[in-house]
Design a protein with these regions (language model features):
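Aromatic-rich, lipid-facing transmembrane alpha helices and their immediate juxtamembrane interface loops
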Residues: 1-250
Length: 250
């Protein structure tokens, strides 16, 4: 019961959640991958999962915002040396596109091409771009904070996991493809998470409930942060995002 009584947060520092330019680049990259997949393979799978996951994740971002589950600061784009604040709903859409459409599209696209060296070079070029984008940033002001073990989120995560395993059981011909997509997403997310943690842009907070039912902030150690971020990578990204495959591909 300690896991339920205590409060665990993922904290984002820096301007990652507020940098609209980078999010737009990721959106464009996802669209280009989908176009290439359609032209060369006559497949709309990437388009389907990109559009579907973006819509759903934008709704999730909106719910996180209005319920104060995630504290979100204003998002900006820089154009012609001007800093322009984006309307909140455009910000939520771009956040939803990156969190949903970008990750699922990249996961599916490169998961299908793990045995092709040319595509792996492109994949790792993307990863290098992401790393450079991380290590060249220095702003460590807190930008968002998300409570990951609310009763609602744990129930949803449990239902999503059951649903995905049910779909895998009923559609065994898709197991290998889903496994490759899972591997691709977890690999990408692990590298991104490591470098954002290393630079101080991503960390965790833990609040323990004492005998008086009051929350006391714990001094977190590396193991605490590792386990919380690992949960985010494996469950909230790897397993949860397979839901979009099952909804829009099968």
């Amino acid at each position: 019961m300690e896991i339920l009584n205590n409060r665990y947060y993922i904290v984002r520092n820096g301007d990652f959640a507020t940098d609209g330019n980078t999010k737009i680049l990721y959106c464009i990259f996802s669209i280009l991958l989908s176009i290439e997949d359609y032209i060369n393979n006559n497949s709309i799978n990437c388009f389907s999962i990109m559009i579907g996951s973006t819509i759903i994740w934008t709704i999730i971002e909106y719910i996180l915002y209005i319920t104060n589950t995630r504290i979100i600061k204003p998002m900006y784009i820089y154009f012609l040396e001007k800093k322009i604040e984006l309307p909140k709903y455009i910000s939520l859409f771009l956040q939803g596109f990156q969190e949903g459409g970008f990750i699922t599209t990249v996961g599916l696209y490169f998961g299908d091409r793990l045995n092709n060296i040319n595509y792996l070079i492109i994949y790792h070029s993307l990863i290098i771009f992401m790393i450079i984008n991380i290590i060249t940033k220095y702003n460590i002001i807190k930008s968002s904070k998300r409570h990951i073990n609310t009763y609602e989120s744990l129930i949803i995560m449990g239902l999503v996991t059951i649903y995905n395993f049910k779909m895998i059981y009923q559609n065994p011909e898709h197991i290998w493809r889903q496994l490759k997509m899972f591997t691709s997403m977890v690999y990408l997310s692990s590298i991104w998470t490591f470098f954002t943690w290393y630079k101080g842009f991503r960390t965790a907070e833990v609040y323990l409930m004492n005998e008086n039912n009051k929350y006391i902030k714990k001094q977190v150690n590396t193991l605490d942060i590792f386990l919380i971020l690992l949960y985010d990578i494996i469950f909230e990204i790897g397993i949860a995002y397979l839901t979009f495959y099952n909804l829009f591909i099968i």
